[in-house]
Amino acid sequence: PPSRRNAIYAVYTFSRRADDAVDSVEELQATPEEAGAKLEQLRALLRGEAPSDPLAPAIEDTIERFGVPLEHFEELIRGMEMDLHNQRYQTFEELYRYCYRAAAAVGLLCIEIFGYQGDPSEHAEALGVAMQLTNILRDISEDLTRGRIYLPLEDLDRFGYSPEELERNELN
């Protein structure tokens, strides 16, 4: 239905803006401070403090029509902030928190729009985290060029493998 489609467009656009803010730093088109300001603009949009933003009416309608919790939007923003400030994760728990925020939060937003019976939030979270972990594994080389290592450092250490070996693409 058009209302659900428009709500998904709004969530996608919000998510894209958050991700683009971080990507702009990685592409040297913005400073971390400028990217942080863009994320704060998204927070202002959620608070209803950005009425001139063309996305504002769509986000407001999505939240009101489908009862989408603001917390899921906020978690997504926090995930993007983690990307701005963290280049590496020490533990899987830290990485899981990032995956939850960067990906599972989007799934949790979407299930509110799709509608459901029962409580699929556990499955939406697991799917979002699994998709983000898959993305991390797929992009290991690309992330290394950006100085990022998403693989938990404690796991590298546990298997006798160093970040330096990973950066040199050494296999052992």
Regions found by a protein language model. Give the residues of each.
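Acidic catalytic motifs of isoprenoid enzymes
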Residues: 1-172
